[in-house]
Amino acid sequence: MAQGWAGFSEEELRRLKQNKDPFEPQRRLPVKKTRQQLQREKALLEQSQKLGLQDGSASLLPEQLLSTPKQRASSQKPPPSSPAVPSPLTLTSSTGDGELHGGESQLQEPGLENSHHGSRSAEIQTPKPDCKVEKKKMELQEKSRWEVLQQEQRLMEEKNKRKKALLAQAIAERSRRTQAETMKLKRIQKELQALDDMVSADIGILRNRIDQASLEYSYARKRFDRAEAEYVTAKLDLQRKTETKEQLTEHLCTIIQQNELRKAQKLEELMRQLDVQADDEALELELEVEQLLREQEAEAARQMAPVERLSQPDGEGVSSELTEENKEPQKPATSPETDKSGKCCSSSPRRLDCPDPGAQNFPAAVAT
């Protein structure tokens, strides 16, 4: 029971499916031919021998013939004595790797299906072909396959050569680009280095100047600190001296005031002892005493002014003024009208000389 093509059995179809090349899916391995195919090939060979081709194509198998002999063979009509034998075109299409589908289409035609039983009877009558022809045919098929493989290999080699050339060209172009980029980068790096050198030189000069300025600033700061310390000490010393001066002036004023009080008391005691009755003389004495007191107060005020100014530190002027003032009251005292008054007046200048030691000690105190 043949389900597909009548020329193959189910076992042969399974074998064909199992023997497919995984690396070459488009090509099929050579398959054992049936008796019908062998008979057709044998008839084709006989026909070619009868025709007697002059170009030597009769010695070759139909698969190895070029297009021109195939066209000639297809153009020639089959002899009327063999109606069961198909034309060479159908035989050539039924053989080879990619010719199985053509044979199947021819066998499935309605005319061939009707003559199927007649071909079987012819197969029984015809003898088996020689094994040598089949071997030659297989060798030729292998050679043709080898040539195809060689051609494919050559094509692949050419493609690889082209790819290598393109790759080398791309590499050369890329290398040129990289060289140009490296040159640009080197130039930019040199420019940056030059800028860095200029900036570093300027920075070095500025740093040296900054160091020098910082040293000068430190020296000036030290001098300022010393001057400030001296100023503070001088100010404190000035304050102490002013305090001592004020204390001395106050002491001088108190001494002068006490001296004047003592003088007044002494004069009163002398007047009581003498019991002066004359009113005129008493009035004159009182006037003289008041005048002396006023002069002493004015002198004390004049002495306070130069002490505060500190323009005349020595006390020679003060002592001279005190001596002059002490001499001035002696003039009216030297001309008394009576002996009592002369005694009193003679004793008064002696009492007026009492503040002289205090006045003499004043310049020494101020100098200290």
Swiss-Prot record:
GO terms for biological process: hair follicle morphogenesis; non-motile cilium assembly; positive regulation of smoothened signaling pathway. Residues 188-368 are annotated as: Necessary for interaction with RCHY1. It is found in: Cytoplasm; Golgi apparatus. The keyword Cytoplasm applies. Keywords: Coiled coil, Cytoplasm, Golgi apparatus. The keyword Coiled coil applies. InterPro entries: GORAB. Residues 1-138, 298-368 are annotated as: Disordered. Residues 145-304 form a coiled coil. One of its GO terms (cellular component) is cytoplasm. Residues 77-86 have a biased composition (Pro residues). Its main location: cytoplasm. Residues 11-27, 129-138 have a biased composition (Basic and acidic residues). Interacts with RCHY1, RAB6A/RAB6 and SCYL1. Belongs to the GORAB family. This is RAB6-interacting golgin. It comes from Rattus norvegicus.
